[in-house]
């Protein structure tokens, strides 16, 4: 059984961690990087084709647009999504979307979509970015 002192210490430690998580701002991705292949870039969720946007929201869940508030940490400050659009674009017959995910762990996600001849969107790739350079990671997925 844990003593009152040890329990109080754990409580203080936990509250301190929660308070500091709120103050930790996620690192901004490099929005000036360019893919190695010709691409058209977009900076708003609203600029995605409707079918791609619908499939993204079905796959990822609710998402704030770039620059809008989202819950980046595990402390919910107000009702808002845990995902936020970063950047997207078209490369050949594919669309890429970068978004950030908050919560207990913060990460960047890269999703690649394609539209079939009937205009339906399909997820081609959807993975956590393991490197900081989202352009390089996207280039790898598009190979």
Predicted regions and their residues:
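Flexible low-complexity loop/turn motifs enriched in small/helix-breaking residues
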Residues: 18-93, 126-143
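Residue-level detector of beta-propeller blades
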Residues: 109, 122-124
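Generic "edge-of-domain/loop-turn" microfeature
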Residues: 104, 120, 130-132
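Bacterial N-terminal signal peptides
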Residues: 8-16
């Amino acid at each position: 059984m844990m003593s009152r002192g040890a329990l109080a210490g754990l409580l203080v430690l936990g509250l301190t961690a929660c308070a500091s998580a709120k103050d930790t701002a996620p690192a901004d991705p490099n929005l000036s990087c360019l893919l190695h292949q010709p691409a058209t870039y977009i900076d708003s969720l609203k600029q995605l084709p409707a079918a791609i946007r619908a499939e993204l929201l079905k796959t990822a869940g609710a998402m704030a647009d770039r620059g809008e508030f989202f819950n980046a940490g595990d402390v919910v400050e107000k009702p808002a999504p845990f995902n936020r659009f970063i950047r997207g674009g078209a490369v050949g017959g594919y669309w890429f979307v970068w978004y950030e995910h908050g919560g207990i762990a913060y990460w960047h996600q890269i999703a690649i979509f394609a539209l079939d001849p009937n205009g339906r969107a399909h997820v081609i790739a959807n993975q956590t970015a393991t490197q900081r350079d989202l352009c390089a990671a996207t280039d790898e997925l598009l190979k």
